[in-house]
């Protein structure tokens, strides 16, 4: 039986740095299995052959999130960077946004704002370019889509907070639903200007910001489950699970405290 040989290459001084493989070099790398599986999933979600008639559309999951999970130094970031690099070479129909770093995510800047901000940066670059009448009109429509998302984003920060009234609670719910629709509309308008069919969003080290990891995961689930979008994340599953567990504990303790206050008022 022929043995499959994988190459492990070390560069002095760069042993712990992520590597960025291309469409040829990744095949003989130790990370080839993980990268190949991710490429296969993206091909399954978004076939490169547009002439293929698919009869399995109902089997394509709505939640198209791909995760590279493992301990520190196991190659998660390398997989993420290599995947983007390979898709840049192979798939001209996919819009590849700059990788989001949760280090910039805090109580004043959530994950959705970072993603929208990355898209808006490209939008500003397009505005500086020469454009014909048709492209100008497309950029105007895209600008309106950004404004709509920005209005809905204003309510996200208070989503998990206790509302002062049932009316405010309903307003928050309506804004949450509205944001999901406005983000989808923004992605569609963005892809038209970019002249791409699909979008790939990559988020590295999602578990590093442990105190806000649960909120990041929830916002991805709520607002980025979009037909034309694949989200790729890298992180340590145990640390992410622990962060989510702690968030549920804090929420449960808050509910218990509210219940105790309500009991005292009614007694």
Predicted regions mapped to residue ranges:
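Conserved small/polar residues in nucleotide/adenosyl-binding loops
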Residues: 261-267
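P-loop NTPase nucleotide-binding core
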Residues: 2-20, 56-194
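Extended non-catalytic scaffold regions that mediate assembly and binding
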Residues: 53-57, 199
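Short, flexible loop/turn elements at secondary-structure junctions
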Residues: 14, 23-25, 70-73, 87, ...
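Conserved Walker B catalytic segment
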Residues: 171-242, 246-253
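N-terminal pre-Walker A segment at the start of P-loop NTPase domains
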Residues: 14-54
